[in-house]
């Protein structure tokens, strides 16, 4: 792999060795004006991961800038201590890598695979890998096609298409990057990086607000409107939902940020669950066909008998998503008020304690 290859795949062990052999100093990269563009690119990598799109400059790298910006970007993400951003950054980097890997030669793909401990060989437009390597990275891919039983296996070796092998490498990249966020950023480096975090935090907070996510990036079910709570409860009880209810629930969950795999997991509880059909429906509703659908409004929900158990907040909204966002804002205000009350209460207790201490200190015999 050459310098351009290292820039495209900075998460590889080869790229790390290259940086070490060139004697780059992280202190210099973080502080010296000569590396200003590296730091700006690192910030942009993180911002792009929040936006979720791979842009032109992500695919046409300036080798040195691109390579060195990767560890700086990781440090910026780690400093937020935000699990949702860590997952999102790992996913974005893996998607970026996948786009680049699609243009690699067979040899290039096998080189990257080798870095992850995958020994592969190419034959007749297929890649042949050991079944243990296949299972290691296909385990997190829940679509029925990834089951080993649905693959061609000969003498312990799995035969996969070029695209499938590339998809496995994408998953390997995602897992490696996400697992690497356990290490803490050295304390002496934090002040230098802090100025780059303001825009990142602002962008992340905006995304979470738009998608109705809690602080840790999880969907807050407490804020669901009654109709969606009811549909989800039925699904969890093993009750089959009619098509209109499935469409409403799936589009609602996708609109507030739940990923496809998590939605698929919910439907596994249904008695009539079929992996292939459910996967097709979820893919179609969440944008696999080129259009991401918005969940139906309250009038449509009532028309199909899916509006159940209205409450007071329902009187002020005409759409399940409006209910969710209003509920999220209300919960945020309540939490802020509770925190402020706790702070004032603690302050009052401290004041009383201080007065008692003063009085005790002035009393006879002390």
Swiss-Prot record:
It holds the Pfam family DNA_primase_lrg. One of its GO terms (biological process) is DNA replication initiation. It comes from the Archaea. Binds 1 [4Fe-4S] cluster. [4Fe-4S] cluster binds at residues 227, 298, 307, 314. Keywords: 4Fe-4S, DNA replication, Iron, Iron-sulfur, Metal-binding, Primosome. GO terms for molecular function: 4 iron, 4 sulfur cluster binding; DNA-directed RNA polymerase activity; metal ion binding. One of its GO terms (cellular component) is primosome complex. Its cofactor is [4Fe-4S] cluster. CDD domains: PriL. The keyword Iron-sulfur applies. Regulatory subunit of DNA primase, an RNA polymerase that catalyzes the synthesis of short RNA molecules used as primers for DNA polymerase during DNA replication. Stabilizes and modulates the activity of the small subunit, increasing the rate of DNA synthesis, and conferring RNA synthesis capability. The DNA polymerase activity may enable DNA primase to also catalyze primer extension after primer synthesis. May also play a role in DNA repair. Heterodimer of a small subunit (PriS) and a large subunit (PriL). Belongs to the eukaryotic-type primase large subunit family. NCBIfam families: PRK02249.1-2 (NF002588). This is DNA primase large subunit PriL.
């Amino acid at each position: 792999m050459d310098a351009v290859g290292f820039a495209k795949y900075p998460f590889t062990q080869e790229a790390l060795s290259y940086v070490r052999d060139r004697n780059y100093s992280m202190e210099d990269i973080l502080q010296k004006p000569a590396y200003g563009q590296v730091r700006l690119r690192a910030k942009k990598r993180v911002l792009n991961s929040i936006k979720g799109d791979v842009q032109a400059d992500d695919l046409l790298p300036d080798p040195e800038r691109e390579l060195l910006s990767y560890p700086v970007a990781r440090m910026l993400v780690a400093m937020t201590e935000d699990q949702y951003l860590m997952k999102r950054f790992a996913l974005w980097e893996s998607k970026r890598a996948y786009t680049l890997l699609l243009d690699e030669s067979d040899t290039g793909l096998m080189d990257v695979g080798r870095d992850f401990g995958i020994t592969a060989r190419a034959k007749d437009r297929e890649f042949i890998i050991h079944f243990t390597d296949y299972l290691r990275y296909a385990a997190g891919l829940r679509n029925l096609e990834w089951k080993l039983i649905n693959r061609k296996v000969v003498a312990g070796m799995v035969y996969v298409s070029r695209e499938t092998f590339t998809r496995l490498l994408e998953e390997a990249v995602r897992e490696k990057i996400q697992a690497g966020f356990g290490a803490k950023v050295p304390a002496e480096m934090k002040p230098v990086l802090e100025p780059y975090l303001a825009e990142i935090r602002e962008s992340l907070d905006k995304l979470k607000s738009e998608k109705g996510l809690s602080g840790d990036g999880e969907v807050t079910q407490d804020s669901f409107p009654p109709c969606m709570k009811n549909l989800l409860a039925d699904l969890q009880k093993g009750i089959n939902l009619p098509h209109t209810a499935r469409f409403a629930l799936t589009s609602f969950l996708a609109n507030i940020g739940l990923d496809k795999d998590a939605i698929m997991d919910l439907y596994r509880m249904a008695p009539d669950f079929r992996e292939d059909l459910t996967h097709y429906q979820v893919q179609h509703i969440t944008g696999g066909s080129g259009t991401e659908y918005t969940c139906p409004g309250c009038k449509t929900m009532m028309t199909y008998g899916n509006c159940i158990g209205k409450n007071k907040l329902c009187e002020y909204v005409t759409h399940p998503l409006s209910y969710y966002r209003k509920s999220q804002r209300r919960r945020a205000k309540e939490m802020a008020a509770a925190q402020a009350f706790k702070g004032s209460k603690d302050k009052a207790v401290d004041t009383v304690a201080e007065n008692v201490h003063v009085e005790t200190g002035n009393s006879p015999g002390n």
